[in-house]
Curated annotation (Swiss-Prot):
GO terms for molecular function: 2 iron, 2 sulfur cluster binding; disulfide oxidoreductase activity; metal ion binding. It is found in: Cytoplasm. Keywords: 2Fe-2S, Cytoplasm, Iron, Iron-sulfur, Metal-binding, Redox-active center. SUPFAM superfamilies: Thioredoxin-like (SSF52833). Belongs to the glutaredoxin family. Monothiol subfamily. It comes from Buchnera aphidicola subsp. Schizaphis graminum (strain Sg). Homodimer. Its main location: cytoplasm. Monothiol glutaredoxin involved in the biogenesis of iron-sulfur clusters. It holds the Pfam family Glutaredoxin. [2Fe-2S] cluster binds at C29. The keyword Transport does not apply. Residues 4-106 form the Glutaredoxin domain. This is Glutaredoxin 4.
């Protein structure tokens, strides 16, 4: 499996997936920490990929997603965006709504 296939599999296999620096318990950058906190507030489980431990994904994902920075939030196979978008969506209530709908529709 090449790196693009690995990325596609991760995105397909996880309803809510964040590509981040570090882990949810120990984020390695402020943006990843803020994004994880926003996701945690929404109250649903999410998967993560630590790009610091997966350098091939760190290199290829920005090209694949056409999004240059991390973290990257994917919900039901769709790129939502990075930290600023996640925080904006949390503030206006859209993040909880989109996450709840994704989880409900997957059952």
């Amino acid at each position: 499996m090449n790196v693009i296939e690995k990325i596609e599999r991760q995105i397909k296999d996880n309803i809510i997936l964040i590509y981040m620096k570090g882990t949810p318990q120990s984020p390695s950058c402020g943006f990843s920490a803020q994004a994880v906190q926003a996701l945690s507030i929404c109250g649903e489980k999410f998967a993560y990929v630590d790009i610091l431990e997966n350098l091939d994904i760190r290199k290829e994902l920005p090209r694949y997603a056409n999004w240059p920075t991390f973290p990257q939030l994917w919900i039901k196979g769709e790129l939502i965006g990075g930290c600023s978008i996640i925080l904006e969506m949390l503030e206006n209530g859209e993040l909880k709504k989109i996450i709840s709908n994704a989880v409900l529709n997957s059952k």
